[in-house]
From Swiss-Prot:
InterPro entries: NADH_UbQ_OxRdtase-like_20kDa, NADH_UQ_OxRdtase_20Kd_su. It is a peripheral membrane protein. It is found in: Cell inner membrane. This is NADH-quinone oxidoreductase subunit B.
Length: 158
């Protein structure tokens, strides 16, 4: 967990970076941006079988209350400005998970004139979750990968 040592008196020593990153990884608040069938799997991951609450993940309805955006589904050109606007409303630090083949690169509709070929053209993406649609386990693995990425960042040195 980033704890460097425990002394005999019950005192824990750590660095500020590790403490901040530990708190951030244990309290990710994602905002759902469900656009298609991948959103059903995202809701499935939030249900009791997978219990994302045990990881400190609580879905928030507002971008101002969340620090993770999960883009799930086909992003069309008409929806791209709304995605960027919602992303800009999120407080720093913020992360994005791209869920499913359509969000990753256009998916089945890649050659359509109205489809954005990957949400990374609109917002910076931290973790890609493959699949059509990806399972709830795949999303859970992607969230764990995001937690590992957050643990490796230097928060004070930014």
């Amino acid at each position: 967990m980033g704890i460097e040592g425990v002394l005999k008196e019950g005192v824990v020593t750590t660095s500020a970076d590790k403490l901040i990153n530990w708190a951030r990884t244990g309290s990710l608040w994602p905002m759902t941006f469900g656009l298609a069938c991948c959103a059903v799997e995202m809701m499935h991951a939030g249900a009791s079988r997978y219990d994302l609450d045990r990881f400190g993940i609580i879905f928030r309805p507002s971008p101002r209350q969340s620090d993770v955006m999960i883009v799930a589904g086909t992003l069309v050109n008409k929806m791209a400005p709304a995605l960027r606007k919602v992303y800009d409303q999120m407080a720093e630090p913020r992360w994005v998970i791209s869920m499913g083949s359509c969000a990753n690169g256009g998916g089945y509709y890649h050659y359509s004139y109205s489809v954005v070929r990957g949400c990374d053209r609109i917002v910076p993406v931290d973790v890609y979750v493959p699949g059509c649609p990806p399972t709830a386990e795949a999303l859970l693995y992607g969230i764990i990968q995001l937690q590992n990425k957050i643990k490796r960042t230097n928060t004070i040195a930014r």
